[in-house]
Regions:
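Catalytic machinery of carbohydrate-active enzymes
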Residues: 1-359
Length: 359
């Protein structure tokens, strides 16, 4: 506990130091005329895969807000490939914040790019790394959400989303206001694309029938669900629809576990060497079941009927968005006592609802 308090104190100290170094320019230049000349804008999203997915619609909205804007994205090794080929992204800068050797080259690259504006992706709390990147970019305009205790670091601020229980996508959408646009739900909705070749490879994994994809990897221990319960879900899907084709995916580190679950549940394990391989399987599925991960966000992006399971307090901000599905939130901080019957009841409702979904 004492070590944690020291860590928080040290982080807060660095944030105060960086904010003082980043004192905003005069009010006279606080609001750019985005349509008046070309602007090169950098959106910072150097974190997890799911964060990139939930930001994708907002990034596209910013890029399309004015024909004069060229949008680059600072990504991490974990999420850079997600936006490969995205028509709204000009250039992807990959930065690994866990590698000290990446800092100086990346900071130098940002400075040489001469960005006109940089957008802070941290919409709920400030980040030392993000503030450092903003400072290093040398961008004249610094765009961020107001009210996080670091307003002095920005000269283009927008008010936060204030609705109770707002989804992370809605919190991020507030950033578009800095560019003079208000994104509706369809415009802020996550957007992903897979190539024809990726679709072809995914199609080869599926047989004929109702395509049900089960992801068993959750990323953190509290979101682990027992093998037997995943098997029970698969058997329920087979009982409900004898024509079902069951495929199981996982992170590479859990391949052995996924193979056992697939075998016991009457399905097959599908290798996904990259996250784009997983996304292609989602895009071609008829139904997805997953714990709270980027897989759930990708299913939202592709509008695939989905049931996703969440630990207490997570579904509201990180649940499914704008697709047929249910975000099942357990009452406990882990999945140890999450009953199969609760999940299969949700699956039944979602599958019934998806029958009336427009083709």
């Amino acid at each position: 506990m004492r070590l944690k308090r020291l860590e928080l104190w040290w982080r807060a100290l660095w944030i105060r130091i960086l904010v003082r170094l980043m004192r905003r320019p005069s009010a006279a230049e606080a609001r750019p005329e985005w349509g008046s000349r070309p602007f090169r804008v950098l959106f910072l999203r150097h974190d997890r895969a799911g964060d990139m997915v939930v930001s994708s619609g907002v990034m596209r909205g910013i890029a399309r807000s004015h024909s004069t804007i060229t949008l680059d994205v600072l990504a991490s090794p974990a999420n850079a490939s997600i936006i490969d080929g995205a028509e709204y992204v000009h250039e992807i800068v990959v930065f690994d914040k866990k590698r000290l050797g990446d800092y100086l080259p990346t900071l130098g690259r940002l400075r040489r790019a001469r960005y006109d504006a940089v957008v802070d992706c941290m919409v709920t709390a400030p980040s030392v790394t993000t503030l450092l990147l903003i400072l290093a970019s040398g961008a004249r305009y610094r765009v961020g959400i107001a009210g996080r205790g670091n307003d002095a670091a920005f000269n283009v601020t927008v008010p936060p989303e204030t609705r109770a229980g707002a989804h992370m996508i809605d919190l991020l959408a507030a950033l578009a206001g800095a560019f003079g646009v208000a994104l509706d739900e369809s415009e802020r909705h996550p957007v992903l694309a897979v190539t024809d070749e990726e679709q072809k490879r995914a199609a080869a994994v599926w047989g004929s029938g109702f395509r049900a994809l089960v992801n068993i990897s959750a990323g953190t221990s509290e979101r682990n669900w027992s093998d037997s319960r995943y098997v029970a879900v698969m058997k329920y899907l087979a009982e409900r629809n004898p024509d079902v084709v069951l495929r199981v995916i996982s992170s590479p580190s859990e391949a052995g576990r996924a193979q056992r679950i697939a075998h016991d549940g009457g399905g097959e394990y599908a290798r996904t060497p990259s996250i784009r391989d997983a996304f292609a399987l989602i895009a071609t599925a008829d139904f997805v079941f997953t714990p709270d991960t980027s897989i759930a966000h990708a299913a939202s992006a592709f509008h695939i009927p989905t049931v996703a399971i969440y630990v207490r307090g997570k579904a509201e901000r990180w649940g499914l968005y704008g697709t047929v599905g249910e975000s099942v939130e357990h009452s406990e901080p882990n999945f140890e006592t999450l009953d199969v019957e609760v999940v299969t009841a949700a699956i039944s409702r979602v599958l019934s609802a998806s029958l009336s979904r427009p083709a």
